[in-house]
Amino acid sequence: MIDWLYSYPPLYPGILLKRYKRFFADVQLASGEVVTAHCPNTGPMTGVSTLGSVVQLSKSANPKRKLAYTLELIQVHDNEPTWVGVNTALPNQIVKLALAKYLFPELGSYNHIKSEVVYGVDKKSRVDFFLTGSDTERPIYLEVKNTTWAKGTLALFPDTETTRGQKHLRELMTLLPQTRSVMLYFINRGDCTEFAPGDSTDPIYGKLLREAIALGLEVLPCRFDVTPEGIRYLGLAKLVI
């Protein structure tokens, strides 16, 4: 039996007909019914949101929700048929579970995990996770980036220009070397074995990432197996810089 880090609720298969206004997706269910689902990923989902793709939806039991269905998975065919997780609310939840289980040995020892800690030059940013251990160990500022775009087996981030992502890199650099700064790329599909910055979509981000690595930023490109049953950690992808 597979020990999933995260198990999906019952999912409903369908076909993606239309995606519009960032938050909406029209899906034809197996029954033939067409429903409008909430799309929790407002980005372009480059190479993923192809019309006609097989998708999986979750359904809320809350009668007050305007849209009962949520788009969770899209099947792509870059390599073999592969499920891609598109619910951007899940990566941080799953990373928190993985941190609690100490699944990332590269981070070393830590005793406390805090989420959404204020940091940055202007104190207007929040880092996803702040890890602390003994007084002799440097604290860890860890940022998570959901990664769904791929070319072959190479995962790429970002899939569009991200001034917010650029800001995060600049702020993590200011913390070095007094603390450890870690960028964790959550590769939300199981068919990728390598990771690289998406230079063609955001060359500034790629330049900043390389500068940050030279200053001591640690990069964890984390591979995850994603299925309609659940999500599990597969280990690190090879970093291609």
From Swiss-Prot:
InterPro entries according to UniProt: SfsA, SfsA_C, SfsA_N
CDD domains: SfsA-like_bacterial
Taxonomy, superkingdom: Bacteria
A matching Pfam family: SfsA_N
MF GO annotations: DNA binding
Annotated family: Belongs to the SfsA family.
NCBIfam families recorded: sfsA
Protein name per UniProt: Sugar fermentation stimulation protein homolog
Species name: Trichormus variabilis (strain ATCC 29413 / PCC 7937) (Anabaena variabilis)
Gene that this polypeptide is encoded by: sfsA
